[in-house]
């Protein structure tokens, strides 16, 4: 099989790669391969059963068109201070420009026009003052809340846009390997159900996301492709009554707080705060389960949940952050300890 451009993974990176090619007037044949399902057929059985069913071969919350974004809290963080090391790679001004551009696309596809955390300046000032008094930094981060259910509608509209503009999307297709010739990628090897075949392309984009990070790391090692370990965030998800977080919820919707507590002074931050939200389980490879938070526009609980994360960066000789995180996640001793800390 031949195409001009093949994209591995239909998460946000893969989706926006295809979309940007279209918006720039590309006439090339684009093939988007995704091992999960289309957005309209992705269903988590927990809604009916009330408990996680450990779906195989993959979790429908993490895998499928739009990745985990379709079932997450549905928030866009509109600040270059949030979201990784991209400002260090391409510059803060460029990142801010790209954030505004990406945000405009979400608005085109139906995102809520309201932005949280920017209207009550005096109240924000008071929250920042209280944060400073406790040794924390409050990050200025406007939030556009799509809502878990609205995010699915938006990604469905994007899926249909890609299809109507000629992008071929194949679901249930797992990329098992790259095809290299003279150190140049000329295609990918694909498994689709019981069938296996090769796709040859002029350009190959690998956008495997968090779900495919371990696979991509091993793929790079197998072919001698230069790559660097990223930051690993390990922590707990805490759930409290809405009344405790009422001021922060009403003023900011989500507070982005950073601290460097003693004795180790590692970076610790809050992440993914969900007022009136719901804690959810996500399953990855090797029987690793993690927790996330969902936040609907209309459906609300009596609790607020958020993650508290400690960031780790790894260098030689130990540069296997994914394996490190998996070992921590699988350790019963660590799990028991973390759960006891969460309950305090």
Where are each of the predicted segments found?
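Dinucleotide-binding Rossmann-like beta1-alpha1 core, especially the glycine-rich loop
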Residues: 64-117
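Residues forming the flavin
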Residues: 1-83, 122-336, 343
């Amino acid at each position: 099989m031949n195409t001009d451009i093949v994209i591995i993974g239909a998460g946000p990176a893969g989706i926006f790669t295809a979309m940007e090619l279209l918006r720039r007037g590309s006439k090339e044949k684009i093939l988007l391969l995704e091992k999960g399902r289309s957005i309209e057929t992705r269903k988590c059985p927990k809604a009916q059963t009330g408990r996680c069913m450990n779906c195989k071969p993959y979790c429908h919350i993490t895998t499928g068109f739009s990745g985990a974004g379709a079932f997450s809290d549905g928030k866009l963080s509109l600040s270059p201070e949030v979201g990784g090391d991209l400002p260090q790679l391409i510059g803060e001004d460029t990142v801010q420009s790209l954030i505004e551009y990406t945000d405009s696309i979400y608005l085109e596809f139906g995102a809520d026009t309201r932005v949280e955390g920017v209207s009550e300046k005096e109240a924000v000032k008071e929250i920042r003052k209280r944060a400073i008094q406790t040794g924390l930094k409050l990050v200025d981060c406007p939030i556009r809340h799509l809502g878990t259910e609205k995010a699915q509608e938006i990604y469905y509209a994007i899926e249909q846009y890609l299809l109507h503009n000629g992008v071929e999307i194949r679901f249930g297709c797992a990329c098992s390997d790259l095809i290299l010739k003279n150190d140049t990628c000329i295609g990918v090897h694909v498994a689709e159900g019981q069938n296996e075949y090769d796709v040859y392309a002029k350009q190959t984009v690998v956008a495997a996301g968090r779900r495919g990070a371990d696979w991509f790391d091993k793929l790079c090692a197998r072919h001698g492709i230069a790559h660097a370990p990223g930051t690993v965030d390990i922590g707990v998800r805490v759930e409290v009554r809405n009344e405790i977080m009422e001021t922060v919820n009403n003023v900011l919707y989500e507070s982005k707080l950073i601290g460097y507590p003693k004795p180790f002074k590692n970076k610790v931050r809050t992440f993914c705060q969900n007022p009136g939200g719901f804690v959810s389980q996500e399953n990855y490879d090797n029987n690793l389960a993690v927790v996330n938070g969902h936040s609907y526009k209309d459906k609300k609980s009596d609790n607020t949940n958020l993650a508290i994360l400690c960031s780790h960066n790894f260098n030689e000789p130990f540069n296997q952050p994914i394996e490190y995180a998996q070992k921590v996640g699988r350790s019963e001793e660590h799990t028991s300890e973390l759960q006891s800390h969460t309950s305090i």
